[in-house]
Curated annotation (Swiss-Prot):
It is a single-pass membrane protein. It comes from the Bacteria. Belongs to the KdpC family. The system is composed of three essential subunits: KdpA, KdpB and KdpC. PANTHER family: POTASSIUM-TRANSPORTING ATPASE C CHAIN, POTASSIUM-TRANSPORTING ATPASE KDPC SUBUNIT. InterPro entries: KdpC (IPR003820). Part of the high-affinity ATP-driven potassium transport (or Kdp) system, which catalyzes the hydrolysis of ATP coupled with the electrogenic transport of potassium into the cytoplasm. This subunit acts as a catalytic chaperone that increases the ATP-binding affinity of the ATP-hydrolyzing subunit KdpB by the formation of a transient KdpB/KdpC/ATP ternary complex. Pfam families: KdpC. Keywords: ATP-binding, Cell membrane, Ion transport, Membrane, Nucleotide-binding, Potassium, Potassium transport, Transmembrane, Transmembrane helix, Transport. It is found in: Cell membrane. One of its GO terms (cellular component) is plasma membrane. One of its GO terms (molecular function) is ATP binding. This is Potassium-transporting ATPase KdpC subunit. It comes from Clostridium botulinum (strain Eklund 17B / Type B).
Length: 201
């Protein structure tokens, strides 16, 4: 008991010091630095035009009409959780289906058929895999350059645009490899679609 009484005050002081340092000072310092150096990224990389917010470049938005660029399959559940007022809450997660299962095979086939039906000009050209599969998060905001270029003709036709103009928009919102060597080039779906709509210039 004596040992406890001797150690406890010291442990409590250390606990309080590190709580203040790590929970308070460190948090305030990092928040302040991030707001000073890169405020847009620190606040969620929100796209805002003329005072209206259209979404974050870091989160996918659902587009499935013929005029817009389609992103990866979004895996969102709106049936499991509700808030205190009974309003449905959306959350995303990867699918638990086995790639070898019949259910997954049928699901991918359904997606492939939809892609082919909406892109008849591509004939038997291989469909980029990211157009028929989910990402790990279920909310991936990017697709591959190949997946974006696959949709160019449909987008141009349904927006009365020239193919080269659609390609220019895609090129504008294509990010290069990290440090020039890591990963692959990716296209931000939301930015492309806002540019197609004339919101982003």
């Amino acid at each position: 008991m004596k040992e406890f009484k001797a150690v406890f005050p010291k442990a409590l002081i250390i606990f309080m010091i590190f709580t203040i340092l790590c929970g308070g000072i460190y948090t305030i310092f990092i928040t302040g630095i991030s707001q000073l150096i890169f405020p847009k990224q620190a606040n969620g990389s929100i796209i805002e035009v003329n005072g209206k917010k259209y979404g974050s470049v870091l989160l996918a938005q659902q587009y499935n009409d013929e005029k817009h660029l389609w992103g990866r399959i979004m895996n969102i559940d709106t049936d499991t959780f509700v808030d205190d007022n009974g309003k449905k809450l959306a959350y995303s997660a990867p699918s638990n289906l086995s790639p070898a299962s019949k259910e997954y095979e049928a699901l991918v086939k359904e997606r492939v058929d939809k892609i082919k039906a909406n892109h008849p000009e591509q004939d038997d050209k291989a469909i980029p895999v990211d157009l028929v599969t989910c990402s790990g998060s279920g909310l991936d905001p990017h697709i591959s350059v190949a997946a974006a270029k696959y949709q160019v003709n449909r987008i141009a036709k349904n927006n009365n645009m020239k193919i080269k103009d659609v390609e220019k928009i895609i090129d504008k919102y294509t990010s290069g490899k990290l440090f020039g060597v890591l990963g692959e080039k990716t296209v931000n779906v939301l930015e492309v679609n806002l540019a197609i709509d004339g919101i982003l210039k």
